[in-house]
Amino acid sequence: MRILVYGAGVQGCELAHRLLQNKKNVVTMLARGEWKERLDQRGLVIRHWVQCRTTVDRVATIDTLAPDDCYDLVFVTMQAGQLPDVLPILKQNRSEYFVFVGNDPHAVEVMQAMQRPADKIAFGFQSSGGHRDVDKVVSAHVGVDMTIGGATAPLSGVFRYRVKTAFEGAKYKLTFVSDMDGWLKCHLALILPACYLCYACSGDLSKATKEQRGLVLDAAWEACEMLKAAHIPVDDKENTDCYRAGTPGRRKMDAMVLALCKTPLGRLCVSDHAMHAVAEMQYLDEAFEGLRTRTSVRMTAWDTLRSQMPSWDIMRKKTAKARR
């Protein structure tokens, strides 16, 4: 299959690496600037942190997508806040099947903007974290998988087969769901409180107090209740029941949050991305606040944790200063 990975950040690089494990695939990455030069000269170098190994893949690159370029599958791994700038380019391209990978609170709107049949647009979330160094990607995962589906309906059999074929022979698990718009909004219910905590601790999760760790999960529970009030589908077994105080699911989540705060895995899986993607997190935060205006649900833990982080203006200035 001819496959394009549109975007060469951590998620796109890990995804391309997995797709290249299927030797029948011809994989191309869209990258720009110095990172494209690195990929062309040295290949796609990924340090798999948990596994203590480094992989190097040779992958073709492009820096623009022309309307007449055609691929069997296009995986878009741009941040949600960057999509408005690239959607016109993607819409004009003659490839049929697109998968938008990552946190996206506006899946339905993206699907509509692509002006294609709903069964030609999918949304996915890949379970890997990490950061990009000057010469390599550092990827943190304990096995990479993707939850994938249509915005508000299951993928067609043809689309499912195409996606499954792309990952044949790859060490990659696919989980198909029927409502990725709802799934992604539920995912933000946990991701955003975790980011608020990162910012409150200046990126050092080891400084988080027991009370703050508890607030993350209390806030996630409140967010799920808010989503229900906003008529967003919520899978209680996978979400609310894991965050409700006093439940077995909550005890497991308490242990997970503690591990993330006390081990380097938390830095690689949570802090690195939060601290390097402030603009994306602000975009997601504003989208979630927009959902809140549709309900009257009180979110005391959420607001308490959110108030402990610096303002978004301060966070952006810190990020800009660190990059100089």
Residue ranges and their predicted role:
Residues 1-52:
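NAD(P)+-binding Rossmann beta1-loop-alpha1 motif at the extreme N-terminus of oxidoreductases
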Residues 44-61, 191:
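N-terminal glycine-rich dinucleotide-binding loop that anchors FAD/FMN and/or NAD(P) in oxidoreductases
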Residues 53-137:
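Rossmann-like NAD(P)(H) cofactor-binding subdomain of soluble oxidoreductases
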Residues 109-187:
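Rossmann-fold dinucleotide-binding core
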Residues 137-151, 199-208, 264-275:
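Helix-loop-beta segment of a Rossmann-like dinucleotide-binding subdomain
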Residues 165-167, 212-237:
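Flavin-binding catalytic cores
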Residues 181-224:
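Active-site-proximal catalytic alpha-helix in oxidoreductases
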Residues 228-324:
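NAD(P)-dependent Rossmann-like dehydrogenase/reductase catalytic/cofactor-binding core
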